Amino acid sequence: RMIGLRMTYYFTDPKRGDVAIFKCPAEGPDYGKLYVKRVIGLPGETVTIKAGQVIITTADGETIYLDESYLNETPREDLTVNNQTYILGDDEYFMMGDNRNNSTDSRFWGNVKRDRFVAKVLFKYWKGFEIIK
């Protein structure tokens, strides 16, 4: 269970690390279904995953090795999707779940266009509230 704020993305663009609610971009049975994932890559960036480590190359050419202390488990290095490179267009974001080994995300159905974003998650609650960082 989560509480999100729809107004956030009317005024600002998603930022790296945001947990966002968005409509599934892939054609098929999940098209339009709401997903909750973390923003990993921003427009114009390249996302490379090597042995489970996420490496971002920004539009300016800076290399960022993501510190992902929020992950639920260590990503499996043997998964093909954990050893790929993804290039984002001007209006695209790369989304990944925090439960990487069992997450259907941008590694499977591609980048998410800006207009698919619905809300920024602020709180999750299950037997108490937790602020999303």
Identify the meaning behind each predicted range.
Residues 1-133:
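Soluble "head" domains of membrane/secretory-pathway proteins
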